Amino acid sequence: MILLAALLVLSVIAGAAAAYNYSKWNTLFQPGAGSLPGNLAEESADLAERAAEEGIVLLKNQENTLPLTHLQINLLGAASDRPFYGGADRDGFSCVSPEEALKEENFLINRELSGFYEKNRIAPAGTAEGQTDFGNYEIPQADYPDGLLDSARDYADIACLVFGRRDAAGSHYPADMEAWTGGDAGRHYLQLTQNEEDLLEAACSRFGTVIVILNTPVPMEADFLSDDRIDAALWIGEPGGQGFRALAAILAGRVSPEGKLPDTWVRDMDCLPGQVSSVPEGDEGQDRTFDACTEGIYSGYRYFETRFPDAGADDPDGLEAYAQSVAFPFGYGLSYTSFERKITNVLNGGDTIHVTVHVTNTGSVQGRDTAQIYVRAPYKEGSPEKPDVRLAGFGKTALLQPGEEEELEITLPLEDLLTWDSAGTVSGQAAWVLEKGSYGILLMEDAHTVTDKKTLKIAEDLVFDDSGRGPKTGQRQAAAPVFDTMTESLAGVTASRADWQAFAEAGPVEWQMPPAVEDPPASAGRLSVKPADNGLRLADLQDREADDPAWPALADQLSASDYRRLLVRQGDCSEAAASVGLPFLLEARLQGGIRNDTAGRTGTLFPSASLLAATRDRALIASVGGRIGSEAAALRAGLVRIPYAGVRRSPLAPSSMVFSEDPLLSADMTVELLQGIQGAGICTCLTGFGQQSGISGSGHSVFLVGEQAARELYLRPFEKAAAAGCVDIICTGPDLLGDTPAWQYSSLMTDLLRGEWGFEGPAAADLLLADPAGTAAGLEAGTDLFYADRAKIDLLTADSAGADDKAVLLQEASIRVH
């Protein structure tokens, strides 16, 4: 019954019952006091600090400014006083402040300056319920007391400026900040404000050493960092509760930075291809945000590395154009030491390519290095679109002392290298393909800088269809098109590397916004629910197979009120259903750390997903997942909802909580995190399926995306998690794919998710911030469980379907989630 969709007390994946029996859930996850034991909290804090140490990225370090040798420093900027830790601004989480962390490393902080920020905090402006505050609270230079900064220079000649940006929590970042506190007309949220520019100029004109700390989960517009007066810069993401301890250790030199950027940092957001067809909410008289993915697969580094290749006879201005656009490439990150890397072997193992990389620490201090392997696939005009390079694998060394060496074995599954051939140019029909030809196996410092390369030949085309290799590993059916309508809508305007000029001249997509879903007519009728007395309890069925007739017999015992409780979730808990012996159970949401607002419980605040991805450390991410699972158990929650899957199309897009702009990195991090959580005996729910954001929106956003981009980029983390069997619930949201809400899109929720991928778990829709009208359409499309305001949704109204038809839909949904 849907009770299993809601709670996964006995989740059935691929027809086999999960490892947790009813008695465990009934005794462990009961309401009441839930808190972290002291040893668990300490271990989690240590792991959170380690994750931040590995993730922080050194962007700039002129003349080896860092690590610092002088202990007296000045902290400047409002974000040095009120930084963004994550977790919706640390609410309920324990956090160590920048000043506290620096003092622990024996730094001496200018208290006169710090006291000024504490006493002159600008009060946040009020926002509507559910709205994110994007105000910028930097203090104008006119409000600084005369002589304060000159006095600070006398205290120490080192200025450490902190500029902060928060996560967007499922929203687009403001494209114009005029309406927000501290904002400027014509500037977007990820630009420096005038007040911040003035502070930076004041610091650069006074202090001999200027260090910039960027406290943001997504890239900011970074052209200002090219100023030679800025000596060093670090990106710290939203570092979590212990992250400033990690930053202090790096500034002091106790830890060498080792993070690698999970996104491309550009000089000007206007150069991003994903911005071309975006209409911010309210623009041009529209009441919805519309994003047309005309760039296709060419987002992030895939665009810049393909659009602006190294200068040559065919593109003499390539290098200059690239440098004018990209400040820091995907995968970039400096260290206090240096490494020599080379490929020593490439072996074609059939379904997997094995690459051996030899790494030597050639510097004077200890450190860890990440070997990044990219693939350059053969391409000719008329073949399926492919980026010039794509990340194919990565590996990380142990802590290497100066002169120490290590060999890394990096595996590249062929299925991670496939291309979606929408036009069927390889096999005559749309399919996943790997074209024959010479493939460059590239060892790179980042997505732009090649260190070593080898060549691998693929002798014949590999086609994953019914007449070729069949479905991909772990899937039920060979892939077939499911987004034809959207693909056709973008025909002729989607970017092709064969003709960049045509893409540049195409302009925004014309799109007619669909009408809002109307409420069902009063005459639609209502279902009559007569619960049976079959004498069954959930505990009786814990070892039954998914197709056992006892499951529908159990479902028949549900009353109308049971349906409302179990199919519609209002918050972070489920209500008990005595008719089938289901207890009250808690869920937790992962937002930096786990939290359950219903019970008022929080765990440890870990770094933001993007900073976790910057670690490139699979084992570490699995450990973080395990710790999150252990904390969920200690807080008596049996399910964790995770918004980190997905791919960041643009820094300004509503995807600030996902891991990366790269699908392989996002997918691998997602799988490791989920496997860690499951290993602690906790169920997992991935949110944001078929959405731009992992956090549910209001249903006012429209995403128009073609088949190739959807499959190769935005759905890839969900696909890989489903194939690995580490996700128990897959949850979509209210925003539209083309003209259809994702939760009512049968091609997504049934054809792809269940038919092709073979996913047996519950499919859910988070509609808490949206109008949930159209339940029958959602059920018919394959959605089983609804997170929604119960007062706004009535499952017993027939909607557009007749009462009998909807009763069948409910019964089918209940059987699916068993």
Regions found by a protein language model. Give the residues of each.
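Glycoside hydrolase catalytic-domain context in secreted enzymes
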Residues: M1-T449, D466-H818
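Extracellular and select intracellular beta-sandwich modules with Ser/Thr-enriched
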Residues: V450-K454
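Short beta-strand edge segments in extracellular beta-sheet folds
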Residues: T455-D465
